C-alpha cells in the first residue's frame, strides 16, 4: 500500500533538527523524523517555511559573536 503526503523535506545538522522539532510544538505543524539529519514537515507550506527560517536566523544571530556588538 502506498501513502502520499504533501509536505517539505528538510536536511539539516542534528542541533538544527532539534530546534525545528522544538519550533513544531509551538507553531503546531507535524514533523516526521526520518533520521538524524532529515525531517519531513507534513503539511508544510510557505508560512511554515518562513516561520522556521526566521526562527533559525534569530537563533544564529543570538549565537554569533561580533566585535561591533561589544558594549562601549
From Swiss-Prot:
Subcellular compartments: Nucleus
Protein's name according to its UniProt entry: General transcription factor IIH subunit 5
Superkingdom as given in the UniProt entry: Eukaryota
InterPro entries membership: TFB5-like_sf (IPR035935), TFIIH_TTDA/Tfb5 (IPR009400)
GO-annotated biological processes: nucleotide-excision repair, preincision complex assembly; transcription by RNA polymerase II; transcription initiation at RNA polymerase II promoter
Keyword Transmembrane helix recorded: no
Subunit structure: Component of the 7-subunit TFIIH core complex composed of XPB/repB, XPD/repD, gtf2h1, gtf2h2, gtf2h3, gtf2h4 and gtf2h5, which is active in NER. The core complex associates with the 3-subunit CDK-activating kinase (CAK) module composed of cycH/cyclin H, cdk7 and mnat1 to form the 10-subunit holoenzyme (holo-TFIIH) active in transcription.
Function: Component of the general transcription and DNA repair factor IIH (TFIIH) core complex, which is involved in general and transcription-coupled nucleotide excision repair (NER) of damaged DNA and, when complexed to CAK, in RNA transcription by RNA polymerase II. In NER, TFIIH acts by opening DNA around the lesion to allow the excision of the damaged oligonucleotide and its replacement by a new DNA fragment. In transcription, TFIIH has an essential role in transcription initiation.
Predominant location category: nucleus
GO CC field: transcription factor TFIIH core complex; transcription factor TFIIH holo complex
Annotated Pfam families: Tfb5
Annotated family: Belongs to the TFB5 family.
Database matches in SUPFAM superfamilies: TFB5-like (SSF142897)
SMART domains with a match to the protein in the record: Tbf5
Keywords noted in UniProt: DNA damage, DNA repair, Nucleus, Transcription, Transcription regulation
Cell membrane found in the keyword field: no
Amino acid at each position: 500500500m502506498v501513502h502520499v503526503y504533501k509536505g517539505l523535506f528538510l536536511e539539516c545538522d542534528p542541533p538544527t533538527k532539534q530546534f525545528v522539532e522544538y519550533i513544531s510544538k509551538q507553531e503546531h505543524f507535524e514533523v516526521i523524523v526520518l533520521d538524524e539529519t532529515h525531517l519531513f514537515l507534513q503539511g508544510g507550506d510557505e508560512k511554515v517555511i518562513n516561520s522556521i527560517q526566521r526562527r533559525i536566523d534569530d537563533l544564529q544571530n543570538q549565537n554569533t559573536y561580533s566585535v561591533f556588538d561589544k558594549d562601549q
